[in-house]
């Protein structure tokens, strides 16, 4: 049994569902908009503190971040905004990325950070099965990939890529466009 597990894109409002998971504490962050985004953390160990969002009202209405502080680390569960078809939210996403990275770095100054979640980006071509037809699509724009590079350059590690440096198509998947599969 997992000590901690995290969900993204829960699309649930507070009290909409009751999960019977004996031994787990549950923490939910719901979007103000019904049926949209949301995150949840389930843990067997009580966190010292749980915070919701990144502390900026312009970014904290979509239920995208839960941070659990434990004695030796912060666990951050994140559901990064999608740039959407036609890249209609790309500009917002870029602003969000900078604010989120600053949030992570502020935590990292006091203790290590474990970031998990759906970051909505394929950082490298190796992360997609068919990268060429996806170049410029949401999740694989130069801008989004650049923000992921900035996160990694700030000292964070893509643990999947660290463990499996040559595995193709392993970190990004989408159900919305057949050409990505």
Model-based region annotation:
Residues 8, 79, 116:
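A cross-family glycoside hydrolase active-site/sugar-binding cleft signature
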């Amino acid at each position: 049994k997992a000590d901690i597990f995290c969900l993204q894109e829960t699309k649930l409002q507070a009290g909409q569902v009751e999960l019977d998971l004996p031994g787990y504490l549950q923490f939910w962050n719901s979007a103000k908009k019904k049926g949209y985004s949301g995150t949840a953390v389930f843990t067997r160990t009580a966190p010292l503190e749980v915070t919701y969002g990144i502390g900026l009202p312009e970014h904290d209405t979509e239920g995208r971040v839960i941070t659990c502080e434990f004695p030796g680390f912060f666990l951050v569960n994140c559901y990064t905004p999608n740039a959407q078809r036609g890249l209609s939210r790309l500009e917002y996403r870029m602003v969000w990325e900078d604010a989120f990275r600053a949030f992570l770095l502020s935590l990292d100054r006091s203790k290590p950070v474990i970031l998990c979640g759906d970051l909505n980006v394929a950082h490298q071509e190796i992360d997609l099965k068919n990268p060429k037809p996806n170049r410029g699509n949401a999740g694989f724009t130069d801008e989004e990939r650049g923000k992921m590079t900035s996160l990694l350059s700030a000292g964070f590690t893509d643990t999947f890529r660290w463990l499996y440096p040559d595995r193709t198509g392993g970190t990004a998947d989408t159900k919305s466009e057949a050409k990505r599969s």
